Amino acid sequence: MTETPIVLNVHFQAAPGHEKELGAQLRALVAPTHEEPGCIIYELHFDPEDPSKFMFYEKFASQAAIDHHVSTPHFQRFQSYLQANNPLAAQSLTKWRGIQ
């Protein structure tokens, strides 16, 4: 049985004063993630009415591809940035699978 690709919808809301830096940190994830095995889609979006809100639409071929993604140096740098700077007012992640 073939594994159905996994879609992740990840929302971030920057804490006041962290909007630009958080946006830059999120943008830095895009290019290297596109090169990862199993990455199908990795798109960063922003709310045009609220510059503190960002959303990733991600599609990976498998859970193994997601596991690899979160172990990469660029993702680990982002996690370190989050821990060191506390730039988030809110964050959520929803995981989806296609209906066959």
Segments the model singles out, each with a brief description of its role:
Residues 31-55:
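Short, glycine- and small/hydrophobic-rich beta-strand elements in well-ordered beta-sheets
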Residues 1-5, 44-50, 80-100:
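Glycine-rich beta-strand-turn "strand-cap" elements at beta-sheet edges
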Residues 13-19:
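Short, surface-exposed ligand-recognition loops at beta-strand->loop->(often short) alpha-helix junctions
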Residues 10, 22, 42, 54-56, ...:
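Hydrophobic packing within well-folded, soluble alpha/beta domains
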Residues 32-40, 59-93:
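An amphipathic, aromatic/His-enriched active-site/gating alpha helix that lines ligand/cofactor pockets
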Residues 16, 50-51, 61-64:
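Short, charged/polar surface micro-motifs in flexible loops or helix N-caps
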Residues 6-12:
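Active-site-flanking beta-strand signature of metal-NTP-handling nucleotidyl enzymes
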